């Protein structure tokens, strides 16, 4: 039995980056040997075990063969006679196809170290084209390592175009697609992810509503530069699309509710946000009510952040509308409902009276 660190742990150590999760590979062992050594089986599709003390995952070396459509259409074979090289060749990129033994010796049968030095994302073998999910994974790695100067190798981009043209991307489930998009959005340069997808034809297959033009991606780039959360980044990406298109994208990818809500509200209200300084008090009140700023102030704050990131992406140095709208929200929230309740108002009458008082507060705010 031989145990190796594989994949990202080896790659990131060689790049001098922090290593968080470690994937372990076991060569030359049987399921029975693993169980006898106290490992607990957890793999549903192929033999994966949890270490009895650390709880880390250890996978038996395996080969795979394409047996159906999509990223799940593979038959796996795990046995003690599967070699380290046979296991590594099934991996996506050469930089992910290195192994390190317990003595620290690195095994690099597919020249991953050379590609690290050349800053290239290159596929290991032609079998790369059998898994459509790899198109998204490579684009995500391009976004992650763009600050280090990495790019997708020309021959790998050609294979990604082949996958995009084959229709195999349509076999990806919404959940798997969103998982990759979500992870890509949180990278340092998420705009690179969408540029790579555009370059290989995958964006047209997965997100035909999206234009990868600089104006759209500039807002996302600003959001990433300012370390904004996922929902803000998603709304920045979709801003500028008509609400019907935003709704279609949200539903097709099954984005989380928080992301869907902010993207939809941004699509519906971005123009009002930009025109805030000229809006009458009635329109201001309507905008605040639409965001339910009284009960959900953070959602409105996230909207203002999207507006600011979009403005910065368009070349604006500041966004004075944000502070103006924050002041308006504070003025409306400051209205005390207690006197209205004490006056005996209830139900619809109370709601109308409260609305009227908030309108007066906004008018006073505008007068300064």
Curated annotation (Swiss-Prot):
Keywords: ATP-binding, Hydrolase, Magnesium, Metal-binding, Multifunctional enzyme, Nickel, Nucleotide-binding, Nucleotidyltransferase, RNA repair, RNA-binding, Transferase, tRNA processing. Its cofactor is Mg(2+); Ni(2+). CTP binds at residues 8, 11, 91, 137, 140. It catalyses: a tRNA precursor + 2 CTP + ATP = a tRNA with a 3' CCA end + 3 diphosphate; a tRNA with a 3' CCA end + 2 CTP + ATP = a tRNA with a 3' CCACCA end + 3 diphosphate. Magnesium is required for nucleotidyltransferase activity. Nickel for phosphatase activity. Mg(2+) binds at residues 21, 23. Coiled coil: none annotated. ATP binds at residues 8, 11, 91, 137, 140. It comes from the Bacteria. Pfam families: PolyA_pol (PF01743), PolyA_pol_RNAbd (PF12627). Its EC number is 2.7.7.72, 3.1.3.-, 3.1.4.-. One of its GO terms (biological process) is RNA repair. One of its GO terms (molecular function) is CCA tRNA nucleotidyltransferase activity. Catalyzes the addition and repair of the essential 3'-terminal CCA sequence in tRNAs without using a nucleic acid template. Adds these three nucleotides in the order of C, C, and A to the tRNA nucleotide-73, using CTP and ATP as substrates and producing inorganic pyrophosphate. tRNA 3'-terminal CCA addition is required both for tRNA processing and repair. Also involved in tRNA surveillance by mediating tandem CCA addition to generate a CCACCA at the 3' terminus of unstable tRNAs. While stable tRNAs receive only 3'-terminal CCA, unstable tRNAs are marked with CCACCA and rapidly degraded. Monomer. Can also form homodimers and oligomers. Belongs to the tRNA nucleotidyltransferase/poly(A) polymerase family. Bacterial CCA-adding enzyme type 1 subfamily. Comprises two domains: an N-terminal domain containing the nucleotidyltransferase activity and a C-terminal HD domain associated with both phosphodiesterase and phosphatase activities. HAMAP family: CCA_bact_type1, CCA_bact_type2. A single active site specifically recognizes both ATP and CTP and is responsible for their addition. This is Multifunctional CCA protein. The gene is cca.
């Amino acid at each position: 039995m031989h145990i190796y660190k594989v994949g990202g742990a080896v790659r990131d150590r060689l790049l001098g980056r922090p290593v968080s999760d470690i994937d372990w590979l076991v060569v030359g062992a049987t399921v029975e040997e693993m169980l006898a050594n106290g490992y607990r089986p957890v793999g549903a599709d192929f033999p994966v075990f949890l270490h009895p003390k650390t709880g880390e995952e250890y996978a038996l070396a395996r080969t795979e063969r394409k047996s159906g459509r999509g990223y799940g259409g593979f038959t796996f074979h795990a046995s003690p006679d599967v070699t380290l090289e046979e296991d590594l060749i099934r991996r996506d990129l050469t930089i992910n196809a290195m192994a390190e033994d317990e003595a620290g010796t690195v095994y690099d049968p597919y020249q991953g170290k050379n590609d690290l030095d050349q800053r290239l994302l290159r596929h290991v073998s032609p079998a790369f084209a059998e898994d459509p999910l790899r198109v998204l994974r490579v684009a995500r790695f391009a976004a992650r390592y763009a600050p280090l100067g990495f790019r997708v190798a020309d021959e790998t981009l050609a294979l990604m175009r082949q996958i995009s043209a084959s229709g195999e991307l349509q076999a990806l489930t919404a959940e798997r697609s969103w998982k990759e998009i979500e992870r890509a959005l949180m990278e340092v340069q998420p705009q690179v992810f969408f540029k790579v997808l555009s370059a290989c034809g995958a964006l047209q297959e997965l997100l035909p509503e999206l234009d990868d033009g600089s104006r759209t991606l500039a807002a996302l780039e600003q959001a990433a530069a300012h370390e904004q959360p996922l929902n803000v980044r998603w709304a920045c990406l979709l801003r500028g699309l008509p609400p019907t298109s935003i709704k279609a994208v949200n539903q097709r990818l099954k984005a989380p509710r928080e992301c869907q809500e902010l993207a939809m509200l941004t699509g519906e209200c971005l123009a009002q946000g930009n025109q805030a300084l000229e809006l009458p008090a009635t329109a201001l009140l309507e905008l605040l009510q639409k965001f339910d700023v009284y009960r959900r102030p953070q959602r409105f704050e996230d909207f203002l952040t999207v507006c600011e990131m979009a403005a910065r992406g368009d070349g604006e140095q500041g966004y004075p509308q944000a502070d103006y709208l924050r002041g308006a929200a504070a003025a409306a929230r400051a209205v005390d409902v207690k006197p209205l309740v004490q006056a005996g108002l209830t139900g619809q009458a109370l709601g109308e009276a409260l609305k009227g008082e908030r309108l007066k507060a906004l008018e006073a705010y505008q007068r300064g």
